[in-house]
Amino acid sequence: MKKEIHPNFKEVKATCTSCGKEHIFGSTVEKISLDVCSNCHAFYTGDRSTVKARGRVERFNKILEKSKTSA
């Protein structure tokens, strides 16, 4: 085998941008930034909030009210 052709594998701290928790991974990359981790992801936390869906329903109801009052 040839020596020194493989990248250096080291432990890297990966920081979640949502909750700020740090995880330690093995990687060849210097810095890892996570959008969502197991600490704050809805699947792992059991949180079943439907913020997006709720907002869309409210928007639909506002449009419906406008159409009723203008008609």
Curated annotation (Swiss-Prot):
Residue ranges that the Swiss-Prot or TrEMBL entry lists as coiled coil: none
Any one of the GO BP annotations: translation
InterPro entries noted in UniProt: Ribosomal_bL28/bL31-like_sf (IPR034704), Ribosomal_bL31 (IPR002150), Ribosomal_bL31_A (IPR027491), Ribosomal_bL31_sf (IPR042105)
Gene3D superfamilies: Ribosomal protein L31
Entry GO MF terms: rRNA binding; structural constituent of ribosome
Ribosomal protein recorded as keyword: yes
Reported function: Binds the 23S rRNA.
NCBIfam families (UniProt xref): L31, PRK00019.1
Name of protein: Large ribosomal subunit protein bL31
Annotated source species: Metamycoplasma arthritidis (strain 158L3-1) (Mycoplasma arthritidis)
Lineage: Bacteria, Bacillati, Mycoplasmatota, Mycoplasmoidales, Metamycoplasmataceae
